[in-house]
From Swiss-Prot:
Signal peptide: none annotated. Binds to alpha-tubulin folding intermediates after their interaction with cytosolic chaperonin in the pathway leading from newly synthesized tubulin to properly folded heterodimer. It comes from the Eukaryota. InterPro entries: CAP-Gly_dom_sf, CAP-Gly_domain, TBCB_Ubl, Ubiquitin-like_dom, Ubiquitin-like_domsf. SMART domains: CAP_GLY (SM01052). It holds the Pfam family CAP_GLY. The keyword Repressor does not apply. Supercomplex made of cofactors A to E. Cofactors A and D function by capturing and stabilizing tubulin in a quasi-native conformation. Cofactor E binds to the cofactor D-tubulin complex; interaction with cofactor C then causes the release of tubulin polypeptides that are committed to the native state. The lineage of its organism: Eukaryota, Amoebozoa, Evosea, Eumycetozoa, Dictyostelia. This is Tubulin-specific chaperone B. One of its GO terms (molecular function) is alpha-tubulin binding. One of its GO terms (biological process) is cytoplasmic microtubule organization.
Length: 270
């Protein structure tokens, strides 16, 4: 019996992707998209997105500095191995000639750079095991009396979101494309923004620019079309053959207004 996808699954695939490896996306011209792994740090420690874009003209000494900011291993203690996308075959060792460029090693999108930490004083692996660390114990009643806690912040933030939604005064038909019904929002085309997840445990966020605000054919209500800074999207501004805005493949995504935060965000780079 053939299985069919629900409307929710279809919409989810168009908005946030269909679960494929994000290394499939191509880096912008003149860049390469590489997966970063570490001999000590686990994948959980590095985060869910350890694929990063790098300029092919980047000198190795500058490449190491960027890796240092990502993993915390000092450049002088790094040994870098370029591996295939399956992380099985070593292609070459990235030597210590800091004036060479990353492009001179001919890396391809999806390949892996594995960092071997040679620091003799490294104790990061011990820090990753928190099972034996002492944990403070406090009753829920005492915790609720405290100010400045995460719980208080979350409650205040949620209340602020609800108030902002209620108090919005800009009509969509005056600030959006294609008649976004009478829903009132404050997001307009050209705004810099951050796309966030509904999942409170998912801290991934994507930066970009609003390119479309309005109704869509694939779902009800108002949707925000965003051109992302990095190829972490699903589409090119079109869904099911309908073009809502123009952008490169994998740079487009759609989100509900509540998942789009407008602000003076700088263009995203590693």
């Amino acid at each position: 019996m053939s299985s069919t996808k629900s409307d929710f699954e279809i919409i989810r695939e168009y908005i946030i992707g269909d679960g494929k490896d994000i290394s499939v996306g191509k880096a912008p011209e003149g860049n390469v998209r590489l997966e970063i792994t570490h001999s000590v740090l686990t994948g959980e420690s590095l985060g869910t997105n350890n694929f990063k874009n790098f300029s092919l003209d980047l000198k190795i000494k500058d490449f190491k500095e960027k890796l240092y900011r990502f993993v915390g291993t000092e450049p002088k203690y790094m040994e870098l191995i370029l591996r295939d996308e399956n992380k099985v075959n070593d292609i070459c060792k990235i030597d210590d000639d800091d004036d060479k460029t990353l492009g001179s090693y001919e890396p391809k999108d999806g390949m892996n750079v594995h960092i071997i930490d040679k620091d003799p004083n490294n104790f990061v692996s011990e820090l990753q095991d928190i099972s034996k660390a002492p944990k403070p114990v406090i009753s829920e009643e005492d915790y609720n009396k405290r100010e400045g806690t995460y719980k208080k912040w979350k409650e205040e933030n949620q209340l602020k979101k609800e108030n902002d939604t209620t108090a919005t005064t800009v009509t969509a038909t005056t600030t959006t494309t294609n008649n976004a019904t009478d829903t009132e929002i404050e997001i307009k085309v050209g705004d810099r923004c951050k796309v966030i997840s509904d999942d409170p445990t998912n801290y991934d966020e994507r930066l970009g620019k609003v390119q479309y605000v309005g109704t869509v054919e694939f779902s009800s209500g108002v949707w925000i079309g965003v051109e992302l800074d990095l190829p972490l999207g699903k589409n090119d501004g079109s869904v099911k053959g309908k073009q809502y805005f123009q952008c490169s493949p994998k740079y487009g995504c759609f989100a509900k207004p509540k998942n789009v935060l407008v602000g003076d965000y700088p263009e995203e780079e590693i």
